[in-house]
């Protein structure tokens, strides 16, 4: 089989798998799914993300698949209780040993949610996230002040939905080594990108302030010399239909506690 033939075959198979995924999920009943199916939800979540990335699923189909899967996750963990947002310990600044005043890029002005579409790879230009910078001028993933790796901490408590650990420097994937964590209280997902070493697994519960990774430069653009070492932090709030809407975490970050 020629290279072009193999490529067409792989693309066709991915489309078939994506369609089977959507059809299968359409028959799920969120009221009868036990908690021990979280790993299945995690696998489905990752597959949807990969299908979107590889453009083997339409944006509408991706949105429907995401919606059904997140409804299942929400039904498993979200109990509708009010978040203890007034508690100063709810948010822990994600970079150990750094303050939000010194770390948040552009004093929060780098956040741009307009035009964001998680399900369409052709939509570009938005940046519904904050980049958190560290002291690493020689770009070796080590703090210039301590000569040690920089710990990335869970901003809030939640369940790890998916994680990537195997990014390679010659990959064109932009997120690098990433982590998705669902916070049942906030009913939304946090995305931590460009990590070096990831220490958590899908299905694992983490508490605010737990170490989840070490700061890195993984990702197609983040790896380049022009990019300072940083953590890319995004929050997607689930609306009533379990679809993602970007949320600005700047105030939460500014009022979070700092771990030294």
Where in the sequence are the language-model features?
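N-terminal secretory signal peptides that target proteins for export/translocation
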Residues: 1-13
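Sec-dependent N-terminal signal peptides
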Residues: 16-25
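A short, sequence-level motif marking secondary-structure junctions
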Residues: 195-199, 249-252
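Short, well-structured beta-strand-loop connectors
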Residues: 151-163, 200-215
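Zn2+-dependent peptidoglycan hydrolase active-site motif and core
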Residues: 147-149, 153-196, 226-230
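Conserved, short, structured surface segments that act as functional micro-motifs
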Residues: 172-181, 204-260
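A generic structural motif
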Residues: 136, 164, 185, 196-199, ...
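Polar/charged, compositionally biased leader and regulatory segments
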Residues: 28-151, 250-260
